[in-house]
Amino acid sequence: MSDLRVRFAPSPTGYLHVGGARTALFNWLYARHFGGTFILRIEDTDTERSTQQSVDAILQGMEWLGLDWDEGPFYQTDNFPLYKQHVQKLLDEGKAYRCWCRPEELEAKREAAMAEGRKPKYDGTCRHRQDQPLDQPHVIRFKAPEEGETAFDDLIKGRIAFPNAELDDLIISRTDGTPTYNFCVVIDDALMRISHVIRGDDHVNNTPRQIQLYEALGYPVPIFAHVPMILGSDKARLSKRHGATSVIAYRDMGYLPEALNNYLVRLGWSNGDDEIFSREEMVQKFDIANVGRSPSVFNPDKLNWLNAHYIKTGNPARLAELLQPHLAGRGVADCSTPDLAGVISTLQERAQTLEEMAERALFYYQAPQQYDEAALSKFDKPHLAAVFSAVAARLSATTAAAAPEFDTLLKEICAEGGWKMPHVGQPLRIALSGSTQAPGIGEIITALGVNETIARIERAREFLAH
């Protein structure tokens, strides 16, 4: 299906949120699955609210997720002359008309309709107006068909039909001459030869109006697929009050792009009972026809579970690159000693996010300045001094270099001292990390190296002496 062309068309009035990211992902996967083209278009016709900062945030979010585009980014503001040509075409063909109704008049009509129990819609006052004071402020409206219905077969929701009597004459050009959203979208999609429009179902009500415009302009009507919305745990539409919604916020909180992609694709789409999909598997198996009609509920616990999976199975060298900014935010400028990939291998099994991993990795780069005194108090000082002396002495003479060897060495120390492993392991873990919540002793010694391990034991002994 090489003629398949899809687009992601965000408005640059904020960041890339998870709902928009899922829409982008579905479009990207559909294009990649069928060998089609994925286009990025920035819908910046709202010049008052659109910002370059928002554009940058959207591009940054998509790049982080790995959603590369084949064409674009295109900007709607570059096409204003083209939109005006199409407005004039409709005027010339009698398919659009000028409207001089003032906002207060329209509001009065809306209130009257509501009071009478009618659906508010423009009543066509200027549709057949003979006098046309062109020097007065006016908008331009599309002359929509008044009879019959406008229907389409949605790939997700099935057939949807709208009685034309319920659709009013859409404004396509404002009083200042700028085109409106629904009009620009139709022109762009038509000229970009978009074959499939995959977007959120909050656009369903726009679709019949856009179909009428396609037909009036003589353009082919694309195939539509409207994706159900994402809800919070309270079944309300996902928003900031449910937690982070920005893609970049999830990056900064320590989530991996593959985890977020995997989670987003499962918000509405399924492939049997499978939960974990690699990028390649998503491309191979995704089909918009398998997206459900019901809204999806955002579950942070499921995202955490997926993120933990990708951290646990991730390449330590790659994770090291991703972890460095999180350590830098904690004052660690140099992650070379100990080797960060080696450190990560001791933490992968237990961390759900990179932020959590960075917090747990901190002791490797910053020797503890204080110790868990409550945990140390469970052992008398003579015992602690004996353990620290025995371990330091054996480490000074050892040629061990790997965690299993250090674990064996500790067992020998326990046997020689007549101690149980917890009576050696816990004090040593506190001496090296400051806490009882740390990886295995052998792993810590391997990552820190023998010299740094001995130095930390000596500092702990000095702490006990005071």
UniProtKB/Swiss-Prot annotation:
GO terms for cellular component: cytosol. HAMAP family: Glu_tRNA_synth_type1. Its cofactor is Zn(2+). Pfam families: Anticodon_2, tRNA-synt_1c. One of its GO terms (biological process) is glutamyl-tRNA aminoacylation. GO terms for molecular function: ATP binding; glutamate-tRNA ligase activity; tRNA binding; zinc ion binding. This is Glutamate--tRNA ligase. Its EC number is 6.1.1.17. It catalyses: tRNA(Glu) + L-glutamate + ATP = L-glutamyl-tRNA(Glu) + AMP + diphosphate. PANTHER family: GLUTAMATE--TRNA LIGASE, GLUTAMATE--TRNA LIGASE, MITOCHONDRIAL-RELATED. The gene is gltX. Catalyzes the attachment of glutamate to tRNA(Glu) in a two-step reaction: glutamate is first activated by ATP to form Glu-AMP and then transferred to the acceptor end of tRNA(Glu). A motif ('HIGH' region) lies at residues 10-20. InterPro entries: aa-tRNA-synth_I_cd-bd, aa-tRNA-synth_I_codon-bd_sub2, aa-tRNA-synth_I_CS, aa_tRNA-synth_I_cd-bd_sf, Glu-tRNA-ligase_bac/mito, Glu/Gln-tRNA-synth, Glu/Gln-tRNA-synth_Ib_cat-dom, GluQ/Sye. A motif ('KMSKS' region) lies at residues 237-241.
